[in-house]
Amino acid sequence: MSGMRILTGSVALGGLTYAIWIIFSPGEERKKEILKSLPEANPVRMEETRKRNAIMLQVLKDAAETNDNIARGFGSQK
């Protein structure tokens, strides 16, 4: 009987979790509104992000190609 109680409790908990998920998930209109407000929806912002990522990638490539510790060069110069 203990196994049946655990099984019933697990199924009930799974059903409750699913019901709460359905109740609190956003509808189609809310999903569209959320997608419109994401930063990726703004073309200007996306272009800025692409440029920033390209600069960071170039810095990482330069750092990988050198044997110097470039992190020490940005601190106080002695």
Swiss-Prot record:
One of its GO terms (molecular function) is cardiolipin binding. Coiled coil: none annotated. It is found in: Mitochondrion inner membrane. It comes from the Eukaryota. One of its GO terms (biological process) is ATP biosynthetic process. Residues 1-5 are mitochondrial matrix. Its main location: mitochondrion. Residues 27-78 are mitochondrial intermembrane. The chain crosses the membrane at residues 6-26. The keyword Mitochondrion applies. It is a single-pass membrane protein. Keywords: ATP synthesis, Membrane, Mitochondrion, Mitochondrion inner membrane, Transmembrane, Transmembrane helix. GO terms for cellular component: mitochondrial inner membrane. Required for the assembly of the ubiquinol-cytochrome c reductase complex (mitochondrial respiratory chain complex III or cytochrome b-c1 complex), mediating cytochrome b recruitment and probably stabilization within the complex. Thereby, plays an important role in ATP production by mitochondria. Cardiolipin-binding protein, it may also control the cardiolipin composition of mitochondria membranes and their morphology. Associates with the ubiquinol-cytochrome c reductase complex (mitochondrial respiratory chain complex III or cytochrome b-c1 complex). Belongs to the UQCC3 family. This is Ubiquinol-cytochrome-c reductase complex assembly factor 3.
